Curated annotation (Swiss-Prot):
Signal peptide stretch: none
Record's keyword annotation contains Methyltransferase: no
UniProt protein name: Deoxyuridine 5'-triphosphate nucleotidohydrolase
Subcellular location: Host cytoplasm; Virion
Induction notes from the record: Expressed in the early phase of the viral replicative cycle.
Stored SUPFAM superfamilies: dUTPase-like
Amino acid sequence: MATIFFIQPITEEAEAYYPPSMITNKRKDLGVDVYCCSNLVLQPGLNIIPLHIKVACEHMGKKCGFKIMARSSMCTHERLLILANGIGLIDPGYVGELMLKIINLGDIPVQIWAKECLVQLVAQGDHVPDHINILKRNEIFPLFAPTPRGEGRFGSTGKAGL
């Protein structure tokens, strides 16, 4: 059985960057790059960026969590950007839109261009994905069915602990 990422655009804007397709990970890259779907200007300090996609990950036929990790292109000589929480951990039951909290550590705004990749997705257990399945925007897909975890965003699962 394989490790598969399922990506579904949720806006017309995202459809242009995520056309329906099944991509085979021939290079066996660990991370799946995620596009910015519009031009953005990140002000100094904290910025919240919607990615306009839903994502699910499946390993050995079972839904699993995944991580959002910075790509090396996020921090260059021209810009100093970091993920606010270091690594984003996405629960298997989360079915909402992916969003980023990015901190611009510089003193000036930073331009991000559409189709630029700042982050990548890595399957729980660091399993190399075999396929990336890009779904149609309005397609009904079982892995995005409502769950007790739901679509609650940053910090929505409550207090520390289980």
